[in-house]
Amino acid sequence: MQGKILLRIAYVGTAYCGYQVQPNGITVQEMLNRAAKALFGQDCDVVGCSRTDSGVHARDFRAAISYKGTDVLETAIPEDRIPRAMNAHLPDDIAVLAAKWVRSDFHPRYDVVAKEYEYLIHNGRERDPFLLDRAWHIPTPVSEEALARMQAAAACFVGKRDFSALRAVGADTEAADAVRHVTAATVERTGEMIVFRVRADGFLYHMVRIMAGTLAAVAAGRIDPADLPALIVDGDRRKMGVTAPACGLYLNRVLYPEDL
């Protein structure tokens, strides 16, 4: 067949300098490019749906394979056998979960209609070594009242507006337009884990991590959730919370117009 192959991938980002190939460190894309070359016999580009930062994880990352410098790939390997074949050439912290043929003009990043991220806060009194590099450890207990404030604050993120206040200062972004449409934002607690989930048509640089840091500030009483809508409109990054560590961030789901 001919076209592109869309991969569904999961990875632990701890050992990598983000997704996209760069000269100063090993990235997830570099490992996938190597695996694709080993499988398909020539240089390939494995273009991702997002440029995740160093240390960020993914449960449902999407990337499309084509021969380097082209928009096509040709192979007789059945799509249901590609995941296992790719995984034979990948390290244990990266796994191809599924593969599907898509049209040659499909773009895994620009065809996205929504993404969902999850941020994990471990709220145990003592650190858990099994959560090392998998969650942000905040040992100060979050009361039920503080959790309710976090939930009220998360609701303030929902809507279509300029989110400059939640973008990294000085970020070299592709789009000067900071308007994004957040369709869902929730906070839940399960045992010692506080889970923040957010879905939008796109995200600014460090936006989810700044949201998580802002929610932590709300829990600590440093930001009143009633003030948050005005702070977002004000657009001043300095009035929001810290940028939460990358280790707690997971790309949870990527949505396309088609069921891919």
What are these regions (language model features)?
Residues M1-L260:
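Structured-RNA-binding interfaces characteristic of tRNA pseudouridine synthases
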